A protein has these predicted regions:
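Polysaccharide-binding surfaces and accessory modules of carbohydrate-active proteins
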Residues: 4, 9-12, 16, 29-194
Length: 194
Protein backbone atom coordinates (compact mmCIF):
# COMPACT_ATOMS: atom_id res chain seq x y z
CA UNK A 1 0.00 0.00 0.00
CA UNK A 2 2.84 2.43 0.90
CA UNK A 3 6.27 2.23 -0.65
CA UNK A 4 9.27 4.56 -0.31
CA UNK A 5 11.88 4.38 -3.06
CA UNK A 6 15.12 5.43 -1.37
CA UNK A 7 17.11 6.14 -4.54
CA UNK A 8 14.60 8.66 -5.94
CA UNK A 9 13.13 9.67 -2.55
CA UNK A 10 9.67 8.97 -3.93
CA UNK A 11 6.60 7.89 -1.96
CA UNK A 12 4.07 5.63 -3.70
CA UNK A 13 0.64 5.28 -2.11
CA UNK A 14 -1.23 2.66 -4.07
CA UNK A 15 -4.10 0.20 -4.03
CA UNK A 16 -5.71 -1.85 -6.82
CA UNK A 17 -7.22 1.26 -8.43
CA UNK A 18 -5.05 4.33 -7.88
CA UNK A 19 -1.52 5.60 -7.34
CA UNK A 20 -0.63 8.80 -5.48
CA UNK A 21 3.07 9.65 -5.71
CA UNK A 22 5.30 12.47 -4.52
CA UNK A 23 9.01 12.99 -4.16
CA UNK A 24 11.15 14.88 -1.66
CA UNK A 25 14.02 16.74 -3.31
CA UNK A 26 16.26 19.01 -1.22
CA UNK A 27 13.82 18.41 1.66
CA UNK A 28 10.88 19.91 -0.29
CA UNK A 29 7.87 17.68 -1.14
CA UNK A 30 6.71 17.74 -4.76
CA UNK A 31 3.60 16.05 -6.13
CA UNK A 32 4.19 13.73 -9.11
CA UNK A 33 1.11 11.61 -9.85
CA UNK A 34 -2.49 11.03 -8.80
CA UNK A 35 -4.65 8.83 -10.95
CA UNK A 36 -5.03 5.30 -12.26
CA UNK A 37 -2.67 2.71 -10.80
CA UNK A 38 0.70 2.73 -12.55
CA UNK A 39 3.99 0.83 -12.09
CA UNK A 40 6.54 2.15 -9.59
CA UNK A 41 8.69 3.74 -12.26
CA UNK A 42 10.83 6.83 -11.69
CA UNK A 43 8.13 9.50 -12.08
CA UNK A 44 10.42 12.51 -11.84
CA UNK A 45 10.08 12.89 -15.62
CA UNK A 46 6.49 14.08 -14.96
CA UNK A 47 7.76 17.20 -13.19
CA UNK A 48 6.87 20.56 -14.63
CA UNK A 49 9.51 22.02 -16.91
CA UNK A 50 10.12 25.68 -16.15
CA UNK A 51 10.93 28.38 -18.67
CA UNK A 52 13.40 30.16 -16.40
CA UNK A 53 16.89 29.58 -15.08
CA UNK A 54 15.28 27.86 -12.08
CA UNK A 55 14.72 24.27 -13.21
CA UNK A 56 13.48 21.62 -10.78
CA UNK A 57 15.48 19.00 -12.69
CA UNK A 58 18.83 20.72 -12.11
CA UNK A 59 20.26 20.40 -8.58
CA UNK A 60 20.32 23.67 -6.65
CA UNK A 61 18.18 25.65 -9.11
CA UNK A 62 14.68 24.73 -7.96
CA UNK A 63 12.09 27.46 -7.54
CA UNK A 64 9.01 26.42 -5.61
CA UNK A 65 6.89 28.46 -8.02
CA UNK A 66 7.68 25.90 -10.72
CA UNK A 67 6.85 22.68 -8.87
CA UNK A 68 3.58 21.01 -7.91
CA UNK A 69 4.11 21.72 -4.22
CA UNK A 70 2.80 19.15 -1.76
CA UNK A 71 3.12 21.62 1.16
CA UNK A 72 3.18 25.21 -0.20
CA UNK A 73 3.99 28.00 2.29
CA UNK A 74 4.55 31.77 2.25
CA UNK A 75 7.85 33.32 1.26
CA UNK A 76 9.53 30.46 -0.60
CA UNK A 77 9.24 31.81 -4.14
CA UNK A 78 5.84 30.20 -4.75
CA UNK A 79 3.38 32.91 -5.74
CA UNK A 80 0.28 30.70 -5.57
CA UNK A 81 -1.98 30.48 -2.54
CA UNK A 82 -0.18 28.67 0.31
CA UNK A 83 -1.84 25.95 2.35
CA UNK A 84 0.00 26.93 5.53
CA UNK A 85 0.76 30.29 7.08
CA UNK A 86 2.31 30.59 10.55
CA UNK A 87 3.32 33.94 12.02
CA UNK A 88 5.99 34.32 14.70
CA UNK A 89 6.08 37.02 17.39
CA UNK A 90 7.64 39.54 14.97
CA UNK A 91 4.89 38.98 12.39
CA UNK A 92 7.18 37.02 10.07
CA UNK A 93 5.28 34.53 7.87
CA UNK A 94 8.32 32.91 6.21
CA UNK A 95 8.53 29.14 6.63
CA UNK A 96 11.21 26.71 5.53
CA UNK A 97 9.77 23.28 6.29
CA UNK A 98 12.22 20.51 5.43
CA UNK A 99 11.60 16.75 5.34
CA UNK A 100 12.90 15.02 8.48
CA UNK A 101 11.39 11.56 8.23
CA UNK A 102 8.38 9.34 7.79
CA UNK A 103 6.71 6.31 9.35
CA UNK A 104 3.78 4.01 8.67
CA UNK A 105 1.22 3.55 11.44
CA UNK A 106 -2.07 1.77 11.98
CA UNK A 107 -4.91 4.21 11.23
CA UNK A 108 -4.73 6.72 14.11
CA UNK A 109 -7.78 8.39 15.55
CA UNK A 110 -7.58 12.17 15.11
CA UNK A 111 -8.52 13.53 18.53
CA UNK A 112 -11.27 16.13 18.31
CA UNK A 113 -11.62 15.64 14.54
CA UNK A 114 -13.82 13.48 12.38
CA UNK A 115 -11.74 10.64 10.99
CA UNK A 116 -12.09 7.55 8.88
CA UNK A 117 -11.05 4.00 9.47
CA UNK A 118 -9.41 3.15 6.18
CA UNK A 119 -6.19 1.34 6.92
CA UNK A 120 -2.58 2.22 7.55
CA UNK A 121 -1.50 5.84 7.63
CA UNK A 122 1.68 7.34 6.24
CA UNK A 123 3.04 10.15 8.43
CA UNK A 124 5.55 12.45 6.71
CA UNK A 125 7.28 14.98 8.97
CA UNK A 126 8.69 18.40 8.04
CA UNK A 127 10.36 20.89 10.40
CA UNK A 128 11.41 24.53 10.40
CA UNK A 129 14.09 24.57 13.09
CA UNK A 130 14.46 28.35 13.15
CA UNK A 131 10.75 29.01 13.61
CA UNK A 132 10.25 25.96 15.82
CA UNK A 133 7.42 24.40 13.82
CA UNK A 134 6.78 20.77 12.95
CA UNK A 135 4.21 19.89 10.27
CA UNK A 136 3.11 16.28 9.92
CA UNK A 137 1.16 15.24 6.82
CA UNK A 138 -1.01 12.15 7.34
CA UNK A 139 -2.08 10.12 4.30
CA UNK A 140 -4.57 7.22 4.46
CA UNK A 141 -5.36 5.21 1.35
CA UNK A 142 -8.33 2.86 1.43
CA UNK A 143 -7.55 -0.68 0.28
CA UNK A 144 -10.85 -1.30 -1.49
CA UNK A 145 -11.75 2.15 -2.87
CA UNK A 146 -10.21 4.85 -5.03
CA UNK A 147 -10.12 7.18 -2.04
CA UNK A 148 -7.29 8.99 -0.27
CA UNK A 149 -7.60 11.15 2.84
CA UNK A 150 -5.06 13.61 4.09
CA UNK A 151 -4.74 15.66 7.24
CA UNK A 152 -2.07 17.89 8.74
CA UNK A 153 -0.93 18.14 12.35
CA UNK A 154 1.08 21.16 13.50
CA UNK A 155 3.31 21.26 16.58
CA UNK A 156 5.14 24.19 18.15
CA UNK A 157 8.52 22.63 19.00
CA UNK A 158 10.22 25.94 19.80
CA UNK A 159 10.27 28.31 22.76
CA UNK A 160 8.28 31.14 21.15
CA UNK A 161 4.60 31.76 20.49
CA UNK A 162 3.39 31.03 16.96
CA UNK A 163 0.13 32.30 15.47
CA UNK A 164 -1.71 30.29 12.86
CA UNK A 165 -2.75 32.37 9.85
CA UNK A 166 -4.10 29.52 7.73
CA UNK A 167 -3.89 25.74 7.63
CA UNK A 168 -5.49 23.56 4.98
CA UNK A 169 -5.31 19.78 5.15
CA UNK A 170 -4.65 19.41 1.44
CA UNK A 171 -3.25 21.35 -1.50
CA UNK A 172 -3.27 19.98 -5.02
CA UNK A 173 -1.91 21.49 -8.25
CA UNK A 174 -3.78 20.25 -11.29
CA UNK A 175 -2.22 20.33 -14.75
CA UNK A 176 -3.82 22.68 -17.27
CA UNK A 177 -7.04 21.16 -18.59
CA UNK A 178 -10.78 21.49 -18.97
CA UNK A 179 -12.30 20.59 -15.60
CA UNK A 180 -15.78 20.61 -14.16
CA UNK A 181 -16.19 21.51 -10.51
CA UNK A 182 -18.91 20.18 -8.25
CA UNK A 183 -19.47 22.14 -5.06
CA UNK A 184 -21.81 21.07 -2.29
CA UNK A 185 -22.63 24.30 -0.48
CA UNK A 186 -23.89 24.28 3.09
CA UNK A 187 -22.23 23.42 6.36
CA UNK A 188 -20.96 20.36 8.16
CA UNK A 189 -23.55 17.54 8.01
CA UNK A 190 -25.84 19.90 6.06
CA UNK A 191 -24.30 19.85 2.60
CA UNK A 192 -26.59 20.94 -0.21
CA UNK A 193 -28.74 22.79 2.32
CA UNK A 194 -29.49 26.43 1.51
Amino acid sequence: MFHFEETTKTFYLENNEITYAFTVENGIPEHLWFGARIPRDDLRYTRRVSCTSCDAQLPGTMSENHIAAELPTYGRGDFREPMLGVRDETGNLLLHLVYTGHRILPQPRLDGMPSTFGGETLEVTFEDGEKGLRAVLLYTLFADAAALTRAMRLENIGAHTLMLDRAFGFSFDLPVGAYETLTLAGSWAAERTP
